[in-house]
């Protein structure tokens, strides 16, 4: 035990200096508005504020190691500083003499202060002055560094989030709980600025108090509070306290201290004796082990030398010797705040013993240092941090001591919280180094990727900046030399030059001048500049007054039309009439033609031939499925990406006012919420309105009257009436077999031969094979399916030739290596093998095939040896196109049963078919059942026929008297075969009526007789359509007699070729009596009908 004069000697020693400028500048200053921000402090640790106060003095028989830190206006403030007033020692005389003796001892020249007793740590110990002379010191004497208590059994627990703390690295935490703030200030006021920092397991929890030990990680750090300052996070919010913590060592939490009492062993820590209760302070007390508890006592003993302290102060020493000893913890004064603060009993977490010279540890340390260097080379920020840490006082120890090196690696990494906590909790140095190495390796991979991305971005930016800088220099040079004007001036001049070559109407010229004047006064960076520029560009792209000279040579037009298309007499005659009028008048107005016909008959291709014959430009666009009116009328200029409609786009592309515009699939226009495109076509196709067509984008009248519009459609029923009224309809019927034969021989076969690469090979496609294709494979009215089959034949022939000759007959051409060819023509292109040379290790490169060969040399066509001959006949046709699709043309060829008749139908694909009608009866209640996927109209035709038969049952001989009920006890079932094909239309009326009569009179109908026509309820036969296709189907099926309505005779004479009508007798009837007499001619019932159901006149007949 030391006498009181020793403490008096300590009281005369100079106070510790403030932190050096380096420490104060290296520590990041927390922002009051950003609480608890995690940051690293690799610079030397600043001195603690609580050690700046005076040495300990006895206050009311209590020892205080420190006083609250002084407020320097920078690091913090102490609300209790004004209350801490030092009281004089009880024995003023002894205190004064002790001070004088201490001064005399300190002035002796042989007594030297030494800092060799200071304790080193992983970072400068808070409170050290780095050997600097304290203010007011009389000489170069150094101040000893304080010793951090090695044993501190009870601490105030501060929960932290996001990242754990590591020994030797600062962190600022923000506390918002008023009791915890009060506890921290009490710790500073009593000279015990030590807390324990533990990481919360749940990062979403924001609390300053630990209520359960399982809320935090079991391993934390023992920290010293270096400075505190208050901050206001917002208006109306409570005041917060930001404390800067400096961790010293790892600790392990044992238990929480409850509010009922203090838990622990009750021993006094190394920090010194602190007051307990008020009664014990007034009672007896004794200082225990003061030499090891109060910093600086050993140094005082050194300075006193051999001076006998006991002899100089015998009374005081004797007085204190009798004080009673009472041991308490360092933070007993915080127990009154429980449970509003969390006090924990902790123990130091010791590192397992290890050999520093272990080969494994040294190898891992070397690898860590290497990774540090690699990251420092890639990331300048990381390099600055490591450099800043390297200038600290103890930086040389970090790379020599494994535990500190592992902690440094964990601090600088951005790993997960669990990985960082694992490094902190590890007690094995080797395991800790291994975990730190994994974290640092991940940082290296991230740094490499970041470096690569940064390098790529820099390269692009530098290239653009260089180009921009050179372009600006070039503009300046050209401007000085007068070689080129400003870009906007050049643009304006270009527009003026374009407009000068166009015959703009007066109104359009005025709009152009206004927009051009606006463009001149706009800055190129303005958003409206591009809008105005695009508008003027479209105005100058419209071919105002520019037209193509038309060719009205009739013979030339006939030659062009016949070369491209076979048949289509009506369409060709209409075009020739159009040209004849133009030749007489010298000019023609635009017309609107509508070509209606089944698919594949050449409606679209005939439009191209018409344009070619007239010498006009051709433009095609389809409106099938179109729902947006803006596609026709254009968009408003206010929209981004706005543009004119299709008519204006067509004029821009063809650059003439009189092109031929083909509007395809006009019968398939859709409707939507944003308008009806069919109605928008009215203005464009109306000859009275399209002279001043108004586009939404241009908003100036456009003359479309010189445009020849040709529309195509499959049916007329879906075209709106007002639109159909503005068009001249030309029906394009299907091709008959003879026409298909000519088209295949003259057009399809030569085209397919060239497409297959067999133009120089002797390939013979016999007419019999083509006829078999048409009869058994391609019965459609068009030739599109026929073209597909002919293409297939030539493809099979090409494959057969190559297979038969083999590789020896057709060798591959010898070419140099493809990669060398590319390198010779494009030296900047690198081989694929070099594309992965700069790839970062550990990454995958996709899309790079090192074996891919590329070339720019075109491949020469191969020569087929002469003498190769392929012949396609009707017999071997199935080897090329497979088995036939159609086998029988008629279901009944010989003696059909009663109740069967033969009708003619028009299929949806534009072809005709022979369709038998079958009727049977059974006992029932007089119901009529219809099957065969029949439509509504054909069902009505069956009901009409049934009603006519019932009303004329006596005349037909079905009943014996007119009053006899007919078929009330019989059910009738009507069926039309091929139920998978839908059937609709009124043209089966005569065939159904004939089948009813055949069933009820039990008389068969000749199978070589077919019929078509609609019947009325009173027995009249009405005309129907599709006669050409129906007659073609009858001709193909071998029908010898056709019963057709008399109203269809002009259509048959005009549109049906003689080749189709050959061998068929046509009977033109007007009522059902003529139909029945002709269908049952020569039978017994027909002879009886001559009296009961006579014909008014004989039907007209024609035999071909």
Curated annotation (Swiss-Prot):
Question: What is an example of a GO molecular function annotated in this UniProt entry?
Answer: sequence-specific DNA binding
Query: Could you state one GO cellular component term attached to this entry?
Result: mitochondrial matrix
Feature: compositional bias, Gly residues:
129-139
| UniProt subcellular location | Mitochondrion matrix
Q: What is this protein's name?
A: Lon protease homolog, mitochondrial
| Record-level GO BP terms | cellular response to oxidative stress; chaperone-mediated protein complex assembly; mitochondrion organization; oxidation-dependent protein catabolic process; protein quality control for misfolded or incompletely synthesized proteins
- Keyword Cell division present in the record's keywords: the answer is no
Q: What species was this sequence derived from?
A: Cryptococcus neoformans var. neoformans serotype D (strain B-3501A) (Filobasidiella neoformans)
> In the UniProt entry, which residues are flagged as the active site?
987, 1030
Compositional bias (Basic and acidic residues) at which positions?
A: 80-103
Domain Lon N-terminal residue range list: 155-444
Q: Does the keyword Transcription apply?
A: no
Task: Provide the assembly information.
Answer: Homohexamer or homoheptamer. Organized in a ring with a central cavity.
Which family does the entry's similarity section mention?
A: Belongs to the peptidase S16 family.
Q: State where the transit peptide lies.
A: 1-58
Q: Which domain of life is it from?
A: Eukaryota
PROSITE patterns on file: LON_N (PS51787), LON_PROTEOLYTIC (PS51786)
EC top class named in words: hydrolase
The residues that the entry says bind ATP are: 597-604
Alphabetical keyword list: ATP-binding, DNA-binding, Hydrolase, Mitochondrion, Nucleotide-binding, Protease, Serine protease, Transit peptide
Q: Describe its function.
A: ATP-dependent serine protease that mediates the selective degradation of misfolded, unassembled or oxidatively damaged polypeptides as well as certain short-lived regulatory proteins in the mitochondrial matrix. May also have a chaperone function in the assembly of inner membrane protein complexes. Participates in the regulation of mitochondrial gene expression and in the maintenance of the integrity of the mitochondrial genome. Binds to mitochondrial DNA in a site-specific manner.
What is this protein's gene name? PIM1
Chemical reaction(s) catalysed: Hydrolysis of proteins in presence of ATP
Q: Known EC number(s)?
A: 3.4.21.53
Q: Segment Disordered: which positions?
A: 8-144
The Lon proteolytic domain covers: 895-1082
Main location per the UniProt record: mitochondrion
Q: Which Pfam families match?
A: AAA, Lon_C, Lon_lid, LON_substr_bdg
């Amino acid at each position: 035990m030391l006498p009181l004069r020793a403490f008096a000697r300590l009281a005369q020693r100079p106070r510790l200096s403030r932190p050096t400028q380096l420490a104060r500048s290296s520590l990041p200053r927390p922002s009051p508005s950003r609480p608890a921000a995690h940051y690293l402090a690799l610079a030397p640790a600043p001195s603690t504020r609580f050690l700046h106060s005076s040495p300990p003095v006895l206050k009311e028989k209590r020892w205080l190691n420190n006083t609250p830190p002084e407020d320097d206006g920078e690091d913090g403030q102490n609300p209790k500083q004004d209350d801490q007033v030092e009281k004089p020692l009880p024995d003023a005389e002894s205190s004064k003499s002790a001070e004088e003796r201490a001064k005399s001892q300190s002035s002796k020249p042989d007594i030297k202060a030494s800092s060799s007793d200071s304790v080193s740590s992983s970072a400068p110990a808070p409170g050290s002055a780095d050997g600097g002379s304290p203010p007011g010191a009389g000489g170069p004497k150094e101040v000893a560094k304080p010793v951090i208590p090695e044993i501190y059994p009870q601490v105030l627990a501060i929960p932290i989030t996001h990242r754990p703390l590591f020994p030797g690295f600062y962190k600022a935490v923000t506390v918002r709980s008023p009791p915890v703030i009060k506890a921290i200030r009490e710790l500073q006021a009593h000279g015990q600025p030590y807390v324990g920092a533990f990481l919360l397991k749940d990062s979403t929890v924001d609390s300053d108090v630990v209520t359960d030990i399982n809320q935090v990680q079991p391993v934390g750090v023992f920290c010293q509070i270096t400075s505190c300052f208050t901050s206001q996070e917002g208006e109306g919010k409570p005041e917060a306290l930001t404390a800067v913590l400096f961790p010293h060592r790892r600790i392990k939490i044992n238990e929480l201290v409850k509010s009922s009492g203090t838990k622990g062993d009750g021993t006094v820590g190394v920090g010194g004796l602190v007051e307990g209760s008020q009664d014990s302070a007034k009672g007896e007390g004794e200082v225990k082990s003061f030499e090891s508890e109060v910093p600086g006592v050993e140094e005082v003993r050194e300075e006193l030398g051999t001076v006998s302290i006991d002899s100089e102060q015998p009374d005081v020493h004797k007085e204190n010797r009798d004080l009673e000893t009472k041991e308490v913890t360092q933070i007993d004064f915080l127990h009154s705040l429980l449970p509003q603060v969390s006090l924990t009993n902790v123990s130091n977490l010791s590192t397992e013993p290890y050999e520093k010279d272990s080969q494994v540890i040294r190898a891992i340390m070397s690898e860590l240092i290497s990774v540090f260097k690699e990251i420092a080379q890639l990331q300048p920020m990381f390099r600055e941090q490591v450099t800043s840490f390297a200038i600290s006082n103890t930086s040389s120890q970090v790379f020599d001591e494994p535990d500190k090196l592992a902690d440094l690696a964990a601090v600088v990494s951005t790993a997960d919280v669990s990985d960082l906590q694992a490094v902190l909790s590890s007690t094995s140095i080797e395991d800790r180094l291994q975990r730190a190495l994994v974290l640092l390796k991940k940082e290296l991979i991230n740094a490499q990727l970041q470096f690569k991305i940064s390098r790529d971005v820099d390269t692009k930016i530098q290239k653009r900046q260089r180009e921009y800088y050179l372009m600006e220099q070039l503009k300046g040079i050209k401007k000085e030399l007068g070689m080129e004007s400003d870009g906007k001036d050049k643009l304006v001049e270009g527009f003026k030059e374009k407009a000068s070559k166009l015959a703009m109407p007066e109104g359009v010229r005025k709009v152009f001048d206004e927009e051009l004047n606006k463009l001149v006064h706009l800055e190129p960076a303005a958003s409206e500049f591009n809008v105005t520029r695009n508008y003027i560009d479209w105005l100058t792209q419209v071919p105002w007054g520019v037209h193509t000279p038309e060719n009205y040579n009739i013979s030339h037009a006939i030659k062009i039309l016949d070369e491209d298309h076979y048949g289509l007499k009506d369409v060709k005659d209409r075009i020739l009439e159009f040209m004849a009028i133009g030749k007489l008048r010298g000019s023609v107005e635009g017309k609107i033609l509508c070509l209606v016909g089944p698919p594949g008959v050449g409606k679209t291709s005939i439009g191209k031939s018409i344009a070619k014959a007239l010498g006009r430009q051709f433009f095609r666009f389809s409106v099938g499925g179109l729902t947006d009116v803006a596609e026709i009328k254009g968009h408003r200029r206010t929209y981004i990406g706005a543009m004119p409609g299709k008519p204006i786009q067509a004029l821009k592309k063809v650059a003439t006012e009189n092109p031929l515009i083909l509007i395809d699939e006009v019968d398939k226009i859709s409707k939507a919420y944003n308008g009806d495109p069919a109605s928008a076509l009215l203005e464009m196709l109306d000859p009275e309105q399209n002279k001043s067509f108004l586009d939404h984008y241009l908003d100036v009248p456009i003359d479309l009257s010189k445009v020849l519009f040709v529309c195509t459609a499959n049916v007329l029923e879906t075209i709106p009436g007002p639109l159909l009224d503005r068009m001249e309809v030309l029906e394009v019927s299907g091709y008959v077999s003879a026409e298909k034969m000519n088209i295949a021989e003259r057009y399809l076969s030569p085209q397919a031969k060239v497409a297959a690469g067999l133009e120089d090979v002797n390939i013979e496609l016999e007419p019999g094979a083509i006829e078999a294709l048409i009869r058994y494979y391609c019965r459609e009215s068009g030739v599109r399916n026929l073209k597909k089959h002919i293409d297939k034949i030539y493809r099979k022939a090409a494959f057969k030739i190559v297979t038969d000759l083999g590789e020896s007959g057709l060798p591959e051409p010898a070419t140099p290596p493809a990669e060398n060819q590319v390198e010779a023509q494009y030296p900047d292109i690198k081989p694929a093998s070099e594309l992965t040379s700069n790839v970062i290790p550990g990454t995958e490169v996709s899309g790079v095939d090192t074996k891919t060969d590329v070339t720019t040399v075109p491949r020469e066509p191969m020569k087929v040896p002469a003498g190769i001959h392929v012949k396609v006949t009707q017999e071997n046709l199935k080897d090329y196109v497979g088995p036939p699709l159609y086998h029988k043309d008629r279901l009944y060829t010989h003696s059909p049963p009663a109740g069967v008749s033969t009708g003619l139908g028009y299929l949806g694909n534009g072809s005709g078919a022979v369709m038998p009608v079958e009727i049977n009866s059974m006992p029932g209640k007089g119901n009529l059942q219809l099957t065969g996927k029949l439509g509504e109209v054909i069902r009505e035709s069956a009901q009409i026929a049934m009603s006519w038969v019932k009303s004329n049952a006596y005349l037909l001989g079905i009943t014996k008297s007119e009053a006899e009920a007919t078929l009330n006890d019989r059910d009738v079932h009507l069926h039309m075969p091929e139920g998978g094909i839908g059937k609709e239309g009124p043209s089966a009326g005569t065939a159904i009526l004939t089948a009813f009569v055949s069933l009820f009179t039990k008389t068969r109908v000749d199978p070589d007789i077919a019929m078509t026509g609609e019947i009325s309820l009173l027995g009249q036969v009405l005309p129907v359509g599709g006669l050409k296709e129906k007659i073609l189907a009858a001709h193909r099926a071998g029908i010898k007699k056709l019963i057709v309505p008399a109203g269809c005779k002009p259509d048959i004479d005009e549109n049906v070729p003689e080749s189709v009508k050959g061998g068929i007798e046509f009977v033109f009837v007007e009522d059902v009596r003529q139909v029945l007499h002709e269908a049952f001619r020569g039978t017994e019932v027909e002879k009886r009908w001559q009296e009961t159901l006579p014909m008014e006149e004989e039907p007209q007949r024609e035999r071909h």
